[in-house]
Amino acid sequence: MKRDDLIHPVVSGNKWRKLKGFFQDCDKSKTVLTFGGAYSNHLPAASFALKYFGMHGVMIVRGEELNERSNPYLSYCAAQGMQLHFVSRSEYRALRARQWQPTQEQSQRWNVKEFQVLPEGGAGVHANQGCGEIWSEIYPILTPKHLVLAAGTATTALGILHAMPANSDTQLHVVSAVKGAKKEQELATDLAYSKNITLSWIDETSFGGFGRVNDVLLDKKTSFTEKTAIPIDRNYNAKVLNYLSNVRLNGTVVWLNTGGYPLFERL
């Protein structure tokens, strides 16, 4: 296991890799407008970074039925001084379709004037570059036959694919934490095909979608942590664990632990 979860207790794993370039280059005087779901790892990580740099953050959360007290993820963001707005799923989809650019009405409603957009999951050029560093850290040491990781927006997988050489002997296994993530699957599949890299995309069909778990998965997660003393989160890495426990892979297998917030799950 490559333990990127140890990078930072809050800006954990792939989150630091996605965010560091943005915060190096952004205008610290402008509000950051960013987006995520109720159990987004991105929002707490961005909250920590925004507070650290003394910046104002406005977070648009998918799910109009939610509030700042709905779960520890959202409560943490509010406690860091972030301004949270909750929108319907249809409004959120429309924002995604507009590349996260708000309408004039939305800007007025959320009271954002001078702002810069940080896309959902931290996706973008900075994130691709940051996540590409993962490959250079893994390959010289382990030369894996299989590299297995979780995906939400697939930003980490895309960054790794960009960094991998064409015709690589390493097979990439991407375990989606999201049900029916067809756009993300298509982006990863097309990039892998263009570089002649073997990619397996595992859709989230076993548990009902993002944030959904059952007792079998939770038991596997608990048992793994008891045996290894390695905490893993339920939304992403527990589903990688489930995949690895049900598939037989020959050769060196590296599990990329992309971090998460198992601490929040106990609150």
PLM region spans:
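Positively charged, low-complexity intrinsically disordered leader regions
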Residues: M1-T31
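Short glycine/serine/threonine-rich phosphate/pyrophosphate-binding segments
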Residues: L19, Y39-A45, G152-I160, A238-L241
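A short, small-residue-rich loop immediately preceding and capping a beta-strand
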Residues: S29-A49, F53-R62, K145-T153
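Active-site-proximal loop->helix
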Residues: P44-R89, H162-A163, K182-S194
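Small/polar-residue-rich loop-to-helix segments that shape phosphate-bearing ligand pockets
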Residues: E64-L142, S200-D219
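Glycine-rich phosphate/pyrophosphate-binding loop at beta-loop-alpha junctions
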Residues: N128-G208, Y261-L267
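Active-site-adjacent helical/loop segments in soluble small-molecule enzymes
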Residues: I202-G251
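Phosphate-binding loop/pocket of nucleotide- and phosphate-handling active sites
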Residues: R248-L267
